[in-house]
UniProtKB/Swiss-Prot annotation:
Gene3D superfamilies assigned: 5' to 3' exonuclease, C-terminal subdomain, Beta Polymerase, domain 2, BRCT domain, DNA polymerase beta, N-terminal domain-like, DNA polymerase, thumb domain
SMART domains xrefs: POLXc
Gene: POLL
Gene Ontology MF term list: 5'-deoxyribose-5-phosphate lyase activity; DNA binding; DNA-directed DNA polymerase activity; manganese ion binding
Keyword presence, Metal-binding: yes
Region (Involved in primer binding): 390-399
Native organism: Oryza sativa subsp. japonica (Rice)
Reactions accelerated catalytically: DNA(n) + a 2'-deoxyribonucleoside 5'-triphosphate = DNA(n+1) + diphosphate
GO cellular component: nucleus
Protein name (record): DNA polymerase lambda
C-alpha cells in the first residue's frame, strides 16, 4: 500500500506574505495594559503580513533594527522605556490602534495620526487631569503617591495587590522594588547648620494648608461626572486601572466647564476627552443614562466584585477570590475566616468610611492634631494634605504629613503622638503602624493608617499619618497633596531628566540596559520646599489649590 502523501502546505504558506502591508516594519511591542492573548494575535498578524517583531532593543539608543515601537498609551510606553531613549529613537512610536485600524481597512495607514505623545504626560495643561489615589506597597516600603491618595486600600500586613490605586496603575511602575536604599534620616539640610531664618521660611511655606484658597468649580454637568465616577469605581475594582484613570482624568475637566453640555461637539477639543468618552457624553446628554454603566450594574459578577473592592484592604484579586468562593454580599464576607484583621475593620465600618468629611470638620481636626502634636513636641509641623489642601469642599479621608524643622526631633514622635490621640478617643482602630525613624530604615519615614472620629461622634473616618525627616518632607508633602495627574507628570518629567521621583526624595537614576529604566542612586537631591522640587524639574510652580488638574 502506497504511503499517504502529506497534504500540501498551501494553507500555511498562504498565511505568510513577505510583501504584505507591514513590509519593512520591525516592531518592538510594549506588553503593558493589553491582554496577552490579544497581543499574541497582533504579533502573528504583523508577522504574517510582512512585518517582524523584535524582542529586544539596542542598549545605546536608536533602536537597532527596530523601526516601530507599539504601545497601548503613553503610560504603558513609559513603564517599559526610558523617556531619554525615546527622544533618541528615530522610528515611529504609535499606539496599537494603528495596527488595529490597518487590519480593519486592509491597508497601511499614515502613522502620524496614531503617534503617542508621551511628552504630554508631563506638560501642564490649563484644563485636564484628575485626582487619584496613592498607596503603600507595604508597611516597610516607600509609597509613591500619585495624587491626593483618597482611595488607597491596603492589606493588613501592607502587601498591596494589583489593587485599585489609580495613582498606581501597575505595581511595578510606581513602587521601587527590593530593599530600601534610603540613607539615614539625618542630613545636612536638616541639621544644626540650618539657620533660624531658614527654619522660619520653611514653616511659613510648608505649613500652609491652603485654607484660604478653596477649589469650587462650576460643576454644571453632574449628570455626566456622577456616571463617570461610578465607572471609575467599577474599573478600579476590576483591576483595569487604565480605563479607570481615563474617566478619572476627565472629571475635573468637565467639572470646570462654565456651561452645561448639550452636545458632544462642545467637548471635542478638550484635554482628556477622547473619542470613547465623547461618545459616552453624547449618549448621556441625549438619553440621560449610559448603557455601559447599566450593563455593569446588571452583571452580578461585576456588581459583586465592585462592592467587595470598596472594602478597605480588599484589592481586585482578593475581591475576585471572594466572589469565586460564592460570596455575594457584605454579610457573606463576615463569615469568611480568610479576611485579615484590617479587612475586617474595613468591613465593619464600611458605611462610615464611605462618607465624605466636610471641609470645616477636617480643618477643626487638623487644628486639634497640631495642638496635640505641639504639646508633645514644640515646633512640630502638621499639615493635612490631599484634597483638603487642594481646596476641595469635602474629603474621602485625611492625609496628615508631619515633620520638625530641626531635622532630628521627629525621630520617635509618631508612637507618642498616636498614644496621645488614642487617649483622647480621636484615634480608634489601627490598620497599619510602622516605625523606621529610630533605626533609619525605609528613609526614616514613619507611617500610621487607621480610623478616627470627629470629637463627640462615633462615625469613623480614614486617617493616615506620615512623619518625614526634614530633608524628605517636601517630597512627602508634594506626593500626599497630589493630585494624581500632577504627580504622574512630575515623575515622568523626572525620568526624562535622569531622575527618579517618589515621596521620599528625588534621586539620580542609575542606567539600565536595552533602553529600560535602571534603579536609583542612594544620593538624594536637596530640596527644602515643594517649590524647590518644581524648580529642579523645570515645572511651573502651582499653588496647592491649582493642583486639581
Amino acid at each position: 500500500m502506497a504511503p499517504k502523501r502529506k497534504p500540501p502546505a498551501r494553507a500555511a504558506a498562504a498565511k505568510l506574505d513577505p510583501d504584505g502591508m507591514f513590509r519593512g516594519v520591525s516592531a518592538f511591542v510594549v506588553p503593558h495594559a493589553v491582554q496577552s492573548r490579544r497581543l499574541e494575535v497582533w504579533k502573528q498578524r504583523l508577522a504574517q503580513m510582512g512585518g517582524r517583531v523584535q524582542e529586544k532593543l539596542a542598549a545605546k539608543g536608536g533602536g537597532g533594527a527596530v523601526t516601530h515601537v507599539l504601545a497601548a498609551d503613553a503610560k504603558a510606553l513609559l513603564r517599559e522605556l526610558d523617556a531619554a531613549w525615546l527622544h533618541r529613537f528615530r522610528g515611529s512610536v504609535v499606539s496599537f490602534e494603528w495596527l488595529e485600524e490597518c487590519l480593519k481597512s486592509g491597508e497601511r495607514l499614515p502613522e502620524h495620526k496614531f503617534a503617542i505623545n508621551y511628552e504630554e504626560e508631563f506638560k501642564p495643561k490649563k484644563e485636564g487631569g484628575a485626582a487619584g489615589s496613592g498607596v503603600l506597597q507595604s508597611a516597610k516600603r516607600s509609597k509613591i503617591s500619585s495624587d491626593g491618595p483618597e482611595n488607597r486600600k491596603e492589606t493588613a500586613g501592607g502587601n498591596r495587590e494589583s489593587r485599585d490605586a489609580i495613582a498606581h496603575p501597575n505595581e511595578d511602575s510606581d513602587v521601587v522594588k527590593g530593599p530600601s536604599t534610603c540613607t539615614s534620616s539625618q542630613s545636612a539640610s536638616g541639621d544644626s547648620k540650618e539657620t533660624i531664618a531658614s527654619q522660619n521660611a520653611f514653616k511659613a511655606e510648608e505649613a500652609s494648608s491652603g485654607e484660604s484658597s478653596t477649589y469650587a468649580p462650576p460643576d454644571l454637568n453632574r449628570n455626566i461626572t456622577e456616571i463617570f465616577g461610578k465607572l471609575i469605581n467599577i474599573y478600579r475594582a476590576l483591576g483595569d486601572d487604565r480605563r479607570s484613570f481615563s474617566y478619572y482624568k476627565a472629571i475635573p475637566v468637565i467639572e470646570k466647564l462654565p456651561f452645561k453640555i448639550e452636545s458632544a461637539d462642545q467637548v471635542k477639543d478638550l484635554p482628556a476627552i477622547g473619542k470613547s468618552l465623547k461618545d459616552h457624553i453624547n449618549e448621556i446628554v441625549n438619553t440621560g443614562k449610559l448603557s455601559k454603566l447599566e450593563h455593569f450594574e446588571n452583571d452580578e459578577k461585576v456588581r459583586t466584585v465592585s462592592l467587595f473592592g470598596e472594602v478597605w484592604g480588599v484589592g481586585p484579586a482578593t475581591a475576585l477570590k471572594l466572589y469565586d468562593k460564592g460570596h455575594r454580599t457584605l454579610d457573606d464576607l463576615q463569615k469568611d475566616d480568610s479576611l485579615t484583621s484590617a479587612q475586617r475593620i474595613g468591613l465593619k465600618f464600611f458605611d462610615d468610611i464611605k462618607q465624605r468629611i466636610p471641609r470645616h470638620e477636617v480643618s477643626e481636626m487638623e487644628k486639634l492634631l497640631q495642638e496635640v502634636g505641639t504639646d508633645i513636641l514644640p515646633g512640630v509641623i502638621i499639615v493635612c494634605g490631599g484634597s483638603y489642601r487642594r481646596g476641595k469642599s469635602s474629603c474621602g479621608d485625611m492625609d496628615i504629613i508631619i515633620t520638625h524643622p530641626d531635622g532630628e526631633s521627629h525621630v520617635g514622635f509618631l508612637p507618642k503622638f498616636v498614644q496621645r490621640l488614642k487617649g483622647i478617643n480621636f484615634l480608634r482602630e489601627d490598620l497599619i503602624f510602622s516605625i523606621h525613624s529610630i533605626e533609619g530604615t525605609d528613609c526614616g519615614v514613619d507611617t500610621y493608617f487607621g480610623l478616627c472620629t470627629y470629637p463627640g461622634r462615633e462615625l469613623r473616618h480614614r486617617i493616615d499619618l506620615k512623619v518625614y525627616p526634614r530633608n524628605r518632607h517636601a517630597f512627602g508633602l508634594l506626593a500626599w497633596t497630589g493630585n494624581d495627574v500632577l504627580n504622574r507628570r512630575l515623575r515622568i518629567l523626572a525620568d526624562s531628566k535622569g531622575y527618579i521621583l517618589d515621596d521620599t526624595g528625588l534621586y539620580l537614576a542609575t542606567p539600565g540596559s536595552g533602553g529600560k529604566r535602571g534603579g536609583r542612586s542612594d544620593a538624594i537631591i536637596n530640596c527644602d520646599t515643594e517649590k524647590d522640587v518644581f524648580d529642579t524639574l523645570g515645572f511651573p510652580w502651582l499653588e496647592p489649590h491649582e493642583r486639581n488638574l
